[in-house]
């Protein structure tokens, strides 16, 4: 989801609600504590230099149980952030504190913002020797005559 998508969605809802990938809803007293631009400059395992940029929203909950972030206030925060983000329509990554800081993608189902799981991946599979997945499963891949009897 991009910043422009969030702005459009905020214009259609009466309350701002976030749902975690496990289906649980963030407490309604959450705060948006940071919005910024994150740049990741790195070299992948194949030796290719890469740069990724995205907007980062940090969500946090405090003990102020009466706090609610109205859609209009969230839009105002996004407008203030133009000083940092400029006019770039970045993809969004969301941080939310759980047992550690979780990083999520963001989607919208028409009423609720959905925090989506993010996964690691090799960006240079051809260069670092990761084999292609076989097209068909073998019938005898897990037989007792396997080298160690397991799959």
Q: What positions do the PLM features span?
A:
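Short connector loops at helix/strand junctions that flank enzyme active sites
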Residues: 13, 27-29, 50-54, 87-89
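Short glycine-rich, basic-tinged beta-strand/loop micro-motifs
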Residues: 51-64
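Helix-rich interaction surfaces within compact, conserved domain-sized segments
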Residues: 76, 80-132
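Short, solvent-exposed beta-alpha or beta-beta edge segments that form flexible loop/patches at the rim
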Residues: 27-48
């Amino acid at each position: 989801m991009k910043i422009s998508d969030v702005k459009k969605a905020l214009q259609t809802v009466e309350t701002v609600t976030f749902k975690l990938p496990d289906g649980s809803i963030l407490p309604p007293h959450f705060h948006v504590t940071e919005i910024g631009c994150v740049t990741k400059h790195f070299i992948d395992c194949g030796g290719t230099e890469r740069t990724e940029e995205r907007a980062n929203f940090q969500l946090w909950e405090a003990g102020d149980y009466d706090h609610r972030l109205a859609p209009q206030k969230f839009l105002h925060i996004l407008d203030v952030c133009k000083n940092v983000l400029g006019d770039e329509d970045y993809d969004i990554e969301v941080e939310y504190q759980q047992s550690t800081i979780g990083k999520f993608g963001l989607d919208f189902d028409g009423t609720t913002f959905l925090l989506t799981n993010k996964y690691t991946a090799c960006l240079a599979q051809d260069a670092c020797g990761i084999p292609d997945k076989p097209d068909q499963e073998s019938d005898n891949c897990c037989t007792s005559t396997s080298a160690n009897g397991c799959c």
